[in-house]
């Protein structure tokens, strides 16, 4: 199955913390890099057979990746991925920003042109990609 989701990263399940409705899954990326945290339904965990040590693909829509120009503290967002901007494609309303992180991987973020200009995001800039755990999907 082909997907339109730009951010697709392979890893192994490091931990599964079950809840009544939602389950928190920590994914360790193949080849190293930061762990990703996903909050998915308990039903999805059962249906996909997600277990510690099992292979999964982390899926994140580019529109769900926010950017910060400095480390962020005092925030509930679990996935804070430091990286370096490798490319910026700016349009009239939105911009696509590619961020290199951990072992040659990239995340793609789509932000408003206004945010791009306010933050001064440009190629070579250090940024932190921010993704809520509830915005991370998993595939097996």
Question: In which residue ranges do the predicted regions lie?
Answer:
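Short, acidic/hydrophobic/Gly-rich beta-strand patch recurrent on exposed beta strands
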Residues: 24-31, 38-39, 96-102, 109-110
């Amino acid at each position: 199955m082909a997907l339109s989701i730009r951010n697709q990263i392979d890893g192994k399940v490091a931990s599964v913390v079950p809840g009544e409705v939602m389950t928190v899954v920590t994914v360790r990326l193949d080849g190293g890099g930061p762990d990703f945290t996903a909050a998915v339904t308990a039903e999805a965990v059962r249906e996909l057979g997600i277990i510690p040590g099992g292979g999964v693909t982390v899926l994140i829509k580019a529109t769900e990746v926010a950017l910060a120009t400095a480390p962020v503290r005092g925030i509930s967002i679990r996935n804070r991925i430091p990286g370096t901007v490798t490319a910026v494609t700016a349009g009239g309303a939105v911009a696509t920003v590619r961020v290199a992180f951990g072992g040659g991987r990239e995340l793609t973020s789509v932000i408003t042109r206004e945010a791009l200009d306010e933050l001064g995001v440009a190629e070579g800039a250090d940024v932190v990609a921010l993704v809520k755990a509830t915005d991370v999907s998993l595939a097996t």
